[in-house]
């Protein structure tokens, strides 16, 4: 708006603009010095005219008179140009705010509404922000429709010419971690630690947990009374089976627990080279590997 005013009245017009976003109103004011002899009508006003316009003020020469300018004097084309420029600037500010906001929320769970479902992407709205859930970040068995509520984790935020691109995920391991953090207070408080996660999203997950307090069973705390905590997570993940494994300082015990329900005949562990060879009967091999190699 100042560009239009300066173009119409000059750069030194002593004008100010107030924009009321809630009401969609624009107010333009021009400060003029009150004089006896008018030389510059843009910057000055005669004492007689000032007192006539606002007799209650009783102006004197040298005072400042604030004139209210009707935006319509600039013409429809100029006003439309100003509106377009203002709207563009408003969008730029909004995009910057969204980028800054979600850049600080990477790794957090957010809840939005499905806006559009495409073959390779699901677009989610949260207030003014649009989030993209790519196919590879989805749980393959899930189907969503426009208007559905959906919980995801913010994975990354990038800038492109159209504005911030916010990528979210439901298949990421950290999504499972945050779900446990939400449902198990002992994890949020740091009493129980999740050491590792292996997932085949929507099918099966295995997590290794450790308690910092010997009095608290980490597996029992994660499962909850009558399975209340773990079932809340399983339902959110479309009945994904979740195995919770108690950590052990002994490699043989930990590996055997991780390979369950398969039972190895023998284990050959090289702690220095950090690898293990496990032997199984043929009928146990498929269970040992797990769907998608989740046990490996």
Identify the residue ranges that each predicted region occupies:
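RNA-contacting regions in translation and RNA-metabolism proteins
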Residues: 1-295
